[in-house]
Amino acid sequence: MSPADDASLLLGLVQRHLRSLRLSLDPQFPDEDWGFTAQQAVEKLLKVLIVLRDQRPPRSHELSELAALAEVELPTQLLGLQTYAVEARYEEGPFPLPATREKLLEEIEQLLDCCIKAIG
């Protein structure tokens, strides 16, 4: 597969994550589950940018590491989703989100737009 094909495959998964995030904006939906899905979307978007640089992304959930490899500066709020990769899944909370769901979703969608433009 070409880098663009690999990136498109990842973008399909991100679109599924974004649908889940949009459907779970209700504050009754657990922050830990919403944050995990948001973290996964950001992780995959960064991996899209890494793949488009014709590099193989590492098997890592560390957003700051992936952002460095993708040569992208992530907003602080998106970096704040790192907790949801592992800690919020296996430790007792609460784990409050680093910003409102709407703000986080907006920032994730901006990163998605960046990826779509990079694919061309």
Locations of regions flagged by a protein language model:
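Terminal alpha-helical segments
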Residues: 1-120
